Regions:
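Inter-motif core of Ras-like GTPase G domains
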Residues: 13, 33-51
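Non-Sec secretion/translocation targeting segments of pathogen effectors
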Residues: 163-167
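Beta-strand-loop-alpha "switch" segments that mediate conformational coupling across diverse proteins
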Residues: 86, 97-128
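Anionic-ligand binding region
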Residues: 47, 54-80
Length: 167
C-alpha cells in the first residue's frame, strides 16, 4: 500500500454507509490533499476571490491531472466554488470574471458565491458550524444555496447516467 492510498483504504469500508463523504483539506498540495484526491470520487475546488488563489488554480489542476493519471483515474472535478468574496470590490469581480473566462469552458464554475463575513471566522473560532452560529446570515444562506446547487447537479448527472444505461 502506498502512502497516497491510506485514506482511500480507510474510507472504502465507510462508503457503503453514506451517500456523501466530505473531505475538507487545507489549501496546500501536501500529502493529506493528495490522499484526499486519491480517495475521492469527485472534487469541488474552493477558490478565494483573490489574486494568488486564482493563480494557484494552475498548479492545482496539474496536481489533479497527475492524481488522475497515477492514483485515481476516475476522479472528476464537479466544479469550482468562489469563496471569501466581497463582490463590492473590483478585485472580487475581476477574480470571478477571470475564473469563468479561463476555466469555465472546461470546468463548471458554480453560480453560488460564498461571501466574506466575519461570522464565518467567528463560527470556526467558536467551534460551531455556520448554521449553529449564524443560521440566518449571508454565509449560511450562501452555503445552503450551494448545497442545493450541488444536489441539483448530482441529480442531473445521475439522470443522464441512468438514461444512457437504458439505451
Amino acid at each position: 500500500m502506498s502512502r497516497e492510498q491510506t485514506l482511500k483504504l480507510y474510507l472504502a469500508d465507510l462508503k457503503k454507509d453514506y451517500d456523501y463523504i466530505l473531505i475538507d483539506c487545507m489549501p496546500s498540495l501536501g500529502m493529506l490533499t493528495i490522499n484526499a484526491l486519491a480517495a475521492a470520487d469527485s472534487v469541488i475546488v474552493p477558490v478565494q476571490a483573490h489574486y494568488l488563489p486564482l493563480k494557484g488554480m494552475t498548479q492545482l489542476m496539474k496536481t489533479i491531472s497527475k492524481v488522475q493519471r497515477q492514483l485515481n483515474p476516475n476522479l472528476k472535478i464537479d466544479g469550482v466554488l468562489l469563496t471569501l468574496a466581497d463582490m463590492r470590490t473590483k478585485l472580487a469581480r475581476t477574480t470571478e470574471d477571470s475564473l469563468r473566462e479561463n476555466y469555465g469552458k472546461h470546468i463548471r464554475i458554480f453560480k453560488t458565491v460564498i461571501p466574506v463575513a466575519i461570522t464565518a471566522a467567528e463560527s470556526s473560532a467558536a467551534g460551531q458550524s455556520i448554521y449553529e452560529y449564524d443560521k440566518n446570515g449571508t454565509v449560511a444562506k450562501a452555503y445552503a444555496e450551494f448545497t442545493r446547487e450541488v444536489i441539483q447537479c448530482g441529480e442531473k448527472q445521475r439522470n443522464k447516467h441512468e438514461s444512457s444505461l437504458s439505451r
